[in-house]
């Protein structure tokens, strides 16, 4: 990791110590074991939820390889540290982990930690999350703040059109990319929002301004959709 990325990571962590923290563990089911993996995740979520950790299980869709995300949410850095320590000494978790390790339903392919850019958001604010789309942006050197400001403008437009928006800066497991997450009540709601976006003069003007920039603040590197199949809050 080069020095500029390391500095950005440390800056994000220290400046957002009172913001919601999310941990995402991305799993690829073994052939014929998707149901087992989901069952194991639900058992894990029950253990974690009893500790006070909010958990979502998300099935990824278009733009992904159909993996399953196990998502843990914490109110802030203090809660993250406290609950991680609790998990480390949990007999229930240790016993469950040993059982799953002996007969896994899938393999962990990625894990990442993210920090919400909105300090007012709490871990239990995602109880009604159903369908989402994610846009991962890689900021140009020195342009992270410009990207964050662009996110704020886009979020204001999108929320006026009916979507909920959250944005995250990558922490441990990532570099300095940022994730723009749009949340909807259903797939039909997603379609309705997209239709409104296609005729929104404000959104089209914002897009055109970004497209015309000779030195864009960031590059879009990944997009995908998904839906929450289980929520433990």
Question: Where are the language model's segments positioned?
Answer:
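Positively charged n-region of N-terminal signal peptides that target proteins for export
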Residues: 1-4
